[in-house]
Amino acid sequence: DFISSDDPTAWRSGDVLAYDRYIKAYDFYAGLGLYSVDGSGLPIMVCVSYCDFNGLPVDNAGYCGIKYGWAIFGASDVNYFSEAVDVVGHEFTHGVTSSSAVGNYYANASGAINEAYSDIMGNLCEMMGGYTSDTEWLVGENSGYIFRSMSSPMDYKQPVKLGGTYYMPPTDTPSPEENDLGGVHQNSSLLAQMAYILYKAGMSLDEERSLWLTSIELLTPTVGYKEVHAALLMSVDINGLDARYKDVLTEAFRAADMI
């Protein structure tokens, strides 16, 4: 059942903040003509007091998929993650990539690529809206816990090179508990760092938003790094961006041993 109230003091502040953050994420994509996660105005439900099947609080924020005609998101009582625009934008982007790529093989490289897109678009949502003073492309700096850094991944024990320090190799038996599903979060920095590299090379936030969103539409469920590189080069052309960014991307991908 849905509960309503005319009393503005009847709602918990954390729940209201989570609601507000999802509005901001929705508006971020709507500014590009993409309404909701499916691009066609699918209604959104933010479930507060996010729990697992045993009724225990989930110490995370989450995109739970499309259920009964709703895009479902979870906001927990045991953290402040859903009060941070970049974290909420991250989760919202999971819905966008799931719809755009007709699913995603969420493990190994393709899963890490999925996570990178969420970090990138979540940060762009936060920075373009003026909801942070961060210029180092941190993830979660306003949630009470910094998850990752796109400018200095190794500061948070993430790799900057395929097969390098902190890199988690792919696995035939992906498990969220044992190997992070083949490093979907651990290795997300490999692609996510490219957004910061482009930013330092002079690409504006508005140009980044167009670049990355267009490239999402070119991905497949089992995409690899070479395919993402090709999609980004194509996106530079599609969006009429300075051709020198293709050289920046190619140099950065090669430095990371991704092509």
Describe the function of each predicted region.
Residues 1-189, 194-197, 251:
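Extracellular zinc-dependent metalloprotease catalytic-domain scaffold
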Residues 35-40, 203, 239-244:
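Short amphipathic alpha-helical segments with coiled-coil-like heptad repeat character
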Residues 197-208:
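Long hydrophobic segments that form regular secondary structure
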Residues 201, 217-222:
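Hydrolase catalytic cores
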Residues 209-210, 225, 229:
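Extended acidic/polar alpha-helical scaffold segments
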Residues 227-259:
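Beta/coil-rich, acidic/histidine-enriched accessory regions frequently appended to metallopeptidases
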